[in-house]
């Protein structure tokens, strides 16, 4: 990550970025942290601190291992500007195994704003990781009568070291109306003008992130838990892939999916607590060495895929691309080099669940992820088969997959004895979500890699798109014990109750 704002002069702050935020007078007032502080991408010896300003100003961060800020260190971060959606970030270097106390403020060359506070824990040996996905989907937004996005408060109380958001961090294509009528009654949202339509402009994509930050539970969670964000389809549009045809979707005046994707990516990188030297060079797939017991690998299943299609090609090509060659090689190499006992791969879509995307011009089923129905590897499955082969060839043990996307929770065990393709080591995949969205499922499995449903919690037969008030909102937890070195994976409900738990012994 660049020190972008380091060495920025008073004159640069006052004139070079200076298209002021609308409605803000620079004179006589202080720059303000508008939506709290987030921390993210915590790895050995580094973390990112994120905040948003109300005007052109430079982010300044102090951090320490005591609440009194004795022995504090100060870092100057990037400059918030109109070009960054008024967001800024700073790279800090905290010690492992500590609670890190953070205060962040903005300076505009004339004045220093009031600090906003945060804290997070850096892992050492024992680690607690949560994951889930799907925030503010299907029109279910912030319902003050119900207590807002309550699952974030439940997760905060679990005191994790890291939370992995497996994607659908927003629903850019999902307006938030004032009311949603459901079989359980009327769901009443707090909403705002930008969320009454689908996102098309850059500012509308930004507004979806700002909407979530209006929730008290989300902001409290952000201020106490370091995060690792992935993206999925709804950051752009449902089932987004290159070449998607918007001609028949009257909600969109902008019909070029590549234009929407470019704007969506910029907004995601502005609001995600990710470190990077420049947005143009930023990668959503990345490796976070959390400690001696665990390495995290975040995947990007969107940026490098070919168009969604019938997905049953017998040879790889641009049409079958999923992770893409660069990311696939990076992942295999990173897993081989990993020093963490447990290797957790965070994906935005499950491997063996069939996710459909309508039909193509020839009337053939079209698929959204790699799964395409029973049988040998075809289409996008060819990449996954190569990856699983590499893991076996390198004898890489203790690999766990976590994901979201399908709006229910499940534990899947993959084994070559049940599979059509047999050249891989057995592994587990755990699914959890949604966080604050409609609940669906379950979806059918594809037997190519031999998945078995060990546990599943979804709506009763005949019911779907249930509101958060139905109680079927889920997150997962991985607890790695420093003494036994075992990983215990637990699927939890909106109140934190245990639905399923699996203890995994290290190989």
Give each language-model segment a name.
Residues 2-19, 23-507:
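Metal-dependent phosphoester/phosphodiester hydrolase catalytic core
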